[in-house]
Amino acid sequence: MGLWGMLAFPLGFLLASVLLVASAPATPESPGCSNKEQQVTVSHTYKIDVPKSALVQVETDPQSLSDDGTSLLAPGEDGEEQNIIFRHNIRLQTPQKNCDLADSVQDLLARMKKLEEEMAELKEQCNTNRCCQGAADLSRHCSGHGTFLPETCSCHCDQGWEGADCDQPTCPGACNGHGRCVDGQCVCDAPYVGVDCAYAACPQDCSGHGVCVQGVCQCHEDFTAEDCSEQRCPGDCSGNGFCDTGECYCEMGFTGPDCSQVVAPQGLQLLKSTENSLLVSWEPSSEVDYYLLSYYPLGKEQATKQVRVPKEQHTYDITGLLPGTKYIVTLRNVKKDISSSPQHLLATTDLAVVGTAWVNEETETSLDVEWENPLTEVDYYKLRYGPLTGQEVTEVTVPKSRDPKSRYDITGLQPGTEYKITVVPIRGDLEGKPILLNGRTEIDGPTNVVTNQVTEDTASVSWDPVRADIDKYVVRYIAPDGETKEKAVPKDQSSTVLTGLKPGEAYKVFVWAERGNQGSKKADTKALTEIDSPENLVTDRVTENSLSVSWDPVEADIDRYVVSYTSVDGETKQVPVKKDQRSTVLTGLSPGVEYKVYVWAEKGDRESKKANTKAPTDIDSPKNLVTDQVTENTLSVSWDPVQANIDRYMVSYTSADGETREVPVPKEKSSTVLTGLRPGVEYKVHVWAQKGTQESRKANTKAPTDIDGPKNLVTDQVTETTLSVSWDPVEADIDRYMVRYTSPDGETKEVPVSKDKSSTVLRGLRPGVEYKVDVWAQKGAQDSRKANTKAPTDIDSPKNLVTEQVTESTATVSWDPVEADIDRYVVRYTSVDGETREFLVGKDQTSTVLTGMRPGVEYQVDVWAQKGTQESRKTSTKAPTDIDGPKNLVTDQVTETTLSVSWDPVEADIDRYMVRYTSPDGETKEVPVSKDKSSTVLRGLRPGVEYKVDVWAQKGAQDSRKANTKAPTDIDSPKNLAIDQVTETTLSVSWDPVQADIDRYVVRYTSADGESKEFLIGKEQRSTVLTGLRPGVEYKVEVWAQKGARESKKANTEGHTDIDSPKNLVTNQVTENTATISWDPVQADIDRYMVRYTSADGETREIPVRKEKSSTVLTGLRPGVEYTVQVWAQKGARESKKAKTKAPTEIDSPKNLVTNRVTENTATISWDPVRANIDRYMVRYTSADGETKEIPVSKDQSSTILTGLKPGMEYTIHVWAQKGARESKKADTKALTEIDPPRNLRPFGVTHSGGVLTWLPPSAQIDGYILTYQFPNGTVKEVELPRGQQRFELQDLEQGVTYPVSLVAFKGNQRSRTVSTTLSTVDARFPHPSDCSQVQQNTNAASGLYTIYLNGDASRPMQVYCDMDTDGGGWIVFQRRNTGQLDFFKRWRSYVEGFGDPMKEFWLGLDKLHNLTTGTTTRYEVRADLQTFNESAYAVYDFFQVASSKERYKLSVGKYRGTAGDALTYHNGWKFTTFDRDNDIALSNCALTHHGGWWYKNCHLANPNGKYGETKHSEGVNWEPWKGHEFSIPYVELKIRPFGYSRDRFSGRKKRSIGKARMF
């Protein structure tokens, strides 16, 4: 460590001391002085600068040492002149080496010492004359008993002295006001004592048993009280009692000579033990604050647990214990936080109950039993089994499997027998609770099953009988189509006949034995019935070479039918027919031949019997019947001859009106001619063959005779488009006439004419055309011969004759041409004065010019057509000639709005001239001019417009031809030339358009340096953009109009271009709160760039950027906000246009995503909302099996409910925010939906003692079910079932009771909702049995716990243990000793109320025995069953009654019988005694001396409640007549039942113990 380090602490301490001490005022104000002007405060401060290299840590002075020194003034001091402050500034130089530092410190100390000496001198000077007048003398003496203080101008007296000059002695405490001071000593007033009279004297001077200290007696150890006159009790009774003459009288709950002990608890005992709990009780005590119960496994005291039990409670169920473990249970009473001495109890929990047991496999001779190993360790299992109805029981030892389950295969069993099986876990000498189940071996099945004597519908079945005792056999036979029938066969038969079978079917036959609802394995065989034969074989639809055969189908399932047919000459054929057909057609037969037909069914190689019949074929009919050589009254008929041997042919023909004739034709002919027919008649012709009375089918055809044609055809009444045709009518009966007319070019039309007319008019003809006309008669499709002629139409006249192109001497006429084919046209025109001219025009012309006409004359014009000598009608019109018009029209003296027009005058006599001028856009004006003028000036014209000018003469309504010319006005110049829309490289120039119609505008722009450019733009434009300009340059702009070579005056203005703006502005590197922007720099010389960014809600920031930079980072942005970013350049006050872009920050993602309120198909999720302004949230949830759904959620929500989920499924949930197409990062979580409950929980098959529950599984994947059902006494039983199970049988239930049942599904720790139902057993004979005999009569055959009802009153239930086995059963057991684990040395209250576990050792209770045996008409008998390890005995008394509590539960017993000897008669009539209630006649308390509670007399002959295992005389469990007083009987059971009850008088099925369940 360097020297700086060594000196750091002394120097720091020194500096702090200087700052704190030296700054104090030098002279405080004297209390004896009041003139403030004399007060002077002297202070000095040090400011020491220490080099930074020094390791000196100096804490800041809490009082500021500012240069003004104000901190040195006390509050309220305002006289600055009286305050003298010295400030000392000391600076230490940085030392070159450690010795330099030491020298510096020494110098510092020396300097400070000198300053302090100077300060002391100054203080001495300041102190002079500071004290008030006369006070200075005190400083010379203070009477020799004090010290003068110049600071205060007063004496500070020594101890024992007082006064201004310390000349007066003082007494201690000024005698405290209880005496007077004499020469420094107190003389006390009575009753005070002491050197300072501070305390009163002690009472009675502490009675000689103590010392008085400051007025209070300090008593000797064995005395107390204010005056120590009372003798002290031990420990002053510990505050838990009062002391009287040295003896403590304790409060209730305390004991001991000093009342320091709390009364210990009494009667700690075990009421009930289970696998993991011990129910303990003790005698209640109202004088405690609470009980302290502790317990630990034997030998593991360090594992002690302690519970605090309220004083109102005197039982406690210790839970969470280990099965099969011994525990030390300790109970203490606690009062005023003092614990009593403990009472201990050694108790053992039951071995863990074996889990569910079941029969895995049942065979005829074995049962495979399996059960779940308990959670605790066991050594092995005892498995007992025997027939349910017999006494034989076999026991085997089964080692515990290392697997979760153990099993044992019981073999060598009797078929069809129900066995009772018990599994008991063993650990050391401790047996666990047994689990009971039943198993039934299968019935052996029939063997050697055979079928014989099979017919079409019957079969006989036989078999070897089974060994088992059965009720019947069942025979089931199943057809191939699945139809099933069953029949029962008596158990003493081994064969039966199956009837009602279907023919040809292979039946599967099963035979098994049944007893009750149990069936054996099925033996099977097959029975094949014979095939039945077809019936009702018939033939029909016979033709000459085919016939149809049909039959009723067989019942048997066959492969096919076979049809055989044989002709008279012996030819035979066979045809297979499908099995689903019931008919077929035989083809290829010979006509007129008789056949024999056979039909039978086949299946494989089996055939049915054959059915047969006979059938002859028909004669074949003539074919190809045709008619030819038809005339109006004859026709020829021919046909192909038949194959059959016949006698003749027959021909019949029938007219349409029914007239029939018949003609025979020899068999060797095949044609004939029919004569005498009527014209135009259709005949139906039939031809057939005959042989004897047999006829073939008729061949037929139709043959119409020809129709006669019309005659004398003529035409008349011809026009241009019509002509009339007529003829003589035909004789035949026809449908109509047909008229056809054909032009020379082949155009043809046909017209039907009614049969009752003989003329018609043809219309729509073309003029001047010669038509060929044909007329004929029709009937159906038959036509007569045609009559014909020719007829031409008239020529048509010209139409639409008009006059046009009229001049002063000519006129053009035109017309529509005629349709007719003509030679020429003729034109004639005649003036009003009768002058006529006529000329010919070619047929192809439709107009001509009339010449040589006189001006102003109206002519009539006629035009007509000619063909040869044939002429059309004439067409006429009128044609007037025109007057002449002006000539040499010229314009001059043109301005922008006027021009002058002149012309040569017309020769004609007119009324006026008309001048019209029209602009190009159609605006027209007309001006009349006097007939004697030939010029005029047009005014109000538009500039630059070329006008069309027309001039003509008028006379009346007639106008001459117009003379015309064109005259343009001058062009006007552009106006209001202006520059707008300026950019860095363009100027937009606009102007008001000229009025003139121009060709173009010319634009010229010239820069300040003289560079000039010129360009043309369209006349329709009124603005243009000058491009390619240099930024910031001033330009002169000129604009003028042009039309052709003509130009307007020039308009001009000036303007300059803008600064260019940044380009390619882009955003990149965006985060939630920053964004980087960049741009291309401008070309212009600028001062800076400006960046402005504005959020969507209008928040704007603006920052400058140096001109040499082209990017910047925007900070302080908000997440998910789209910012509008603008960047522009600045130079002076001028700015470029702003470049814009968008910069959306990233959306922040949802946080703290959690799920809650999860149901089977919904889950509520919530999250912290994002800060960003978004459109929506998106939620995606994906099930474990991959199904995914997405839903949008409003941006205002931060939670949503997911619906449509699958029960019991884990979902992965993602939530993210969206704005437009943008998305935040996804937050995720998981949600596990609840399991849905089972469905349709229903009972069925309910009996007196049980029923079956069924349900449908939930949709969720589960591990299993928990089924819970409740007994009438409130006991709830819970059964865990595997997931594949959907039914459960409840057994051993009480009759006529409704059991609430609930079922939940579970998966791991998950539970579904509960579904509930009730199962009501069938009512019993005794709905509320009053004792075990009635319970037994309700068909409860197993011993165990049951609920009875006192006197049958449903409101007074009592749970008792019923012995259903001993001597016919029906016993209420009220006492049992068999293990010694339960202490029977109990108080009176315990014996009254009862104690213990009815399934183990217990005492039912005197109150219950009294209620059972008194106040009822039933007389009870009592039985004592006594057993040692190899002997047993019993004693029965035919009467038993226990009196009320008022009579101390006096015992009454009747007559004895049995093998144990009469011990109870001695106790008859005696009251019950316990160690705290002595009701016997002995000198001492028999219960106390014999360790029990009983109906003692002068003690006992029977002591069943004595100390278990005790062999001392009369202290053990004794039955003196049997084993004497020195043998403790290991097993005693006392029980009662109605006198004379016998089970043999009642019947009922046996039953297992309550609550046992059997799984399927």
Swiss-Prot record:
Carbohydrate-modified residues: 1411
Superkingdom of origin: Eukaryota
Gene Ontology biological process terms, A to Z: axonogenesis; cell-matrix adhesion; dendrite self-avoidance; negative regulation of neuron migration; neuron migration; neuron projection extension; positive regulation of neuron projection development; positive regulation of sprouting angiogenesis
Signal peptide: 1-26
Annotated segments matching region Disordered: 868-888, 1044-1063
Cellular component GO terms, alphabetical: CA3 pyramidal cell dendrite; cell surface; extracellular matrix; extracellular region; hippocampal mossy fiber expansion; neuron projection; neuronal cell body; tenascin complex
Domain EGF-like, first and last residues per copy: 167-198, 199-229, 230-260
Tissue/organ expression: Highest expression in kidney followed by spleen and brain. In brain, highest expression is found in hippocampus, cerebellum and olfactory bulb. Expressed in aortic valve, corneal limbus. Expressed in ribs periosteum. During a fracture repair process, expression increases in cells of newly formed perichondrium/peristeum surrounding the cartalaginous callus.
Family: Belongs to the tenascin family.
Predominant subcellular localization, coarse grouping: secreted
Full protein name: Tenascin-N
Oligomer and partners: Homohexamer.
GO MF term list: identical protein binding; integrin binding
Regions of compositional bias (Basic and acidic residues) in chain numbering: 1044-1061
Fibrinogen C-terminal domain ranges (all copies): 1323-1540
Pfam (any one): fn3
UniProt entry keywords in alphabetical sequence: Disulfide bond, EGF-like domain, Extracellular matrix, Glycoprotein, Repeat, Secreted, Signal
Gene source species: Mus musculus (Mouse)
PROSITE patterns to which the protein is assigned, alphabetical: EGF_1, EGF_2, FIBRINOGEN_C_1, FIBRINOGEN_C_2, FN3
Summary of the function given for this chain in its UniProt record: Extracellular matrix protein that seems to be a ligand for ITGA8:ITGB1, ITGAV:ITGB1 and ITGA4:ITGB1. Involved in neurite outgrowth and cell migration in hippocampal explants. During endochondral bone formation, inhibits proliferation and differentiation of proteoblasts mediated by canonical WNT signaling. In tumors, stimulates angiogenesis by elongation, migration and sprouting of endothelial cells. Expressed in most mammary tumors, may facilitate tumorigenesis by supporting the migratory behavior of breast cancer cells.
Keyword hit for Heme: no
InterPro entries named among the record's database cross-references: ECM_Regulatory_Proteins, EGF-like_dom, EGF_Tenascin, Fibrinogen-like_C, Fibrinogen_a/b/g_C_1, Fibrinogen_a/b/g_C_dom, Fibrinogen_CS, FN3_dom
Lineage: Eukaryota, Metazoa, Chordata, Craniata, Vertebrata
Residue ranges annotated for the Fibronectin type-III domain, each copy included: 264-353, 354-444, 445-532, 533-622, 623-706, 709-798, 799-882, 885-970, 973-1062, 1063-1144, 1149-1238, 1239-1325
